[in-house]
């Protein structure tokens, strides 16, 4: 699938200039440029006429598929030779522009053969560690975005963006709940976007529009869970089914459900206890649809 967006629609000259420079650098290594995380979400919402996120991002996260750290070092050198300044020995760069008048933050996330046990440990010490478990599955379904008719970038589909956020939440939920906020934002927009662009492809026997007692967000969860279930390998599908199931078993003690409750809405004076049931129901949908897909694969 291919989308087009103009520089004006992108709405950020620094971002555009950074994408142009990154695209040039990655092309030198024969690598596609994958845009992920919050910036991918923001661009997707512009392309698909979704809601504007309340929490805007001021940086850019990109992913690259590489086999070893030597390739990563070579890419870093190319970036530094093209007006990117590296922050220490980390994956963080700042694009300074040809004239040195920019300062746009970029995080480079490697995945693929460079990962060990589907995790990235930054050299030389091998930390911090982050999961890239779902990255290959997601990037296999990446959509193409042509920016201003000049540059081509790959972007995780919305269902893949949700999954990357779930991975990130699983890594750091003890210290932050912002990944749950991002997941919930995608979920709240998912049904409307799918009905706008995929209205003739409603998953059969999955999205229960005939059950009018359900909130629209549950229909969105059904569709989102279905799309994710078709994107994942069986091993990864089992992992995320187990993750969601384990959180449901914790009931009110679940961090995942609690974080969703905080951002679900309908709370007064900081009391969001009434959000427990709809948030529990959302994750029950994921477990049900993931489990159904796993059972169907066993029969094949």
Predicted regions and their residues:
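Compositionally biased terminal segments of proteins
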Residues: 1-300
